[in-house]
């Protein structure tokens, strides 16, 4: 997992569009930074925001390492489809 995720990648984690993620950043729902090539979400924020959703789907609490592994899996799967 990179230090920052794009809004597209964050959308994959939250099952939302990249536009929805940008709106969430602008509305202060999630932390993000604006760069010349678009918004980015810091890794720590991506972990925080996606933890509840992923843990509810898994039906249990996950360690940070497990959570990062699942996030990497989601990102890899979606990149292969794109």
Pin down the residues of each PLM region:
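A short, Lys/Arg-enriched interface patch at domain edges and termini
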Residues: 44-82
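DNA major-groove recognition helix of helix-turn-helix
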Residues: 25
């Amino acid at each position: 997992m990179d230090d920052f995720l794009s809004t597209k990648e964050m959308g994959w984690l939250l099952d939302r569009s990249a536009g929805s993620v940008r709106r969430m950043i602008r509305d202060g729902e999630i932390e993000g930074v604006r760069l010349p090539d678009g918004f980015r979400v810091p890794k720590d924020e991506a972990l925080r925001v996606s933890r509840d959703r992923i843990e509810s789907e898994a039906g249990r609490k996950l360690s940070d390492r497990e959570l990062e592994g699942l996030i990497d899996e989601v990102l890899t799967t979606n990149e292969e489809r794109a």
